[in-house]
Amino acid sequence: MPSDELVVLVHGLGANKLLMWPLARRLARAGYRTVNWSYPSFLRTIERHGANLRELLDRLDAEPEAARIHLVAHSMGCIVARQALLSGVPRKIGRFVMLAPPNQGSPLASLFGPLTRCCFPTIDQLARRPDSFVNRLLEPDGLEIGVIAARVDWLVGVANTHLPCQRDHIVVSGTHSLMVFQSGVAREVVEFLRQGRFTAANRTK
C-alpha cells in the first residue's frame, strides 16, 4: 500500500484522539499515513467543529505528498465529518468509513439533549426528532461511504446508523465505544478503504 494515501481519524462525543490511537496504529501498519484529529466535542456546535475539520482537510488536500485522503470517524465524529463536507468534497477525498454513526440521531441525545442544550449543544443536535440538526443535515455528495454498526449499542441503534447514500453496511459484534479497539473492525476499515466494500462474511443481510 503506497504511503501517499492518508487517513484522517475523527473521534466522537466525550472522547479524544487517544480513543482512536489503536485504530490509527493498525491503519499505519496497513501502509496508510494517519492524522488523528482532536476537538473539544462537548464545547461549541457541530457546525463549528465541521468548519475546523474542513480547514484541516483543505490544507491536506493542498499537500503534494497526499495523493488520496480517506476519512474514518466514530460516532458524532461522523456527523462532524459530514458537516465538513457540506460545502463540497475536496478533490483528493477518497472513501469514508463511519463507525457507529448517529446518522438518524441517538435516543439518549433525545432524552438528555433538551436538558443540556445550554451547556452542551452538540448533544441536542444529535436528537432523533425529525427537525434535529442531524436529521436535517444533507448527505455527502459523490462519496463512497461504508458504515460499521455495533451489534450491542445502547447509544446508537443499528437502525439509526444507516445513510441512504451508503455504499455498504455491516454489523459487527461489540459495543459502541469498544468497537474502535477491535482488530476485526480495523480489518473491515482497511478492506473498505482498499476495495470500496466490506468483507462478504460480515455484510448486512
Language model regions located:
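Serine-dependent carboxylesterase/thioesterase catalytic core
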Residues: 2, 7-18, 22, 26-40, ...
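Helical cap/lid subdomain of alpha/beta-hydrolase-fold lipid enzymes
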Residues: 86-205
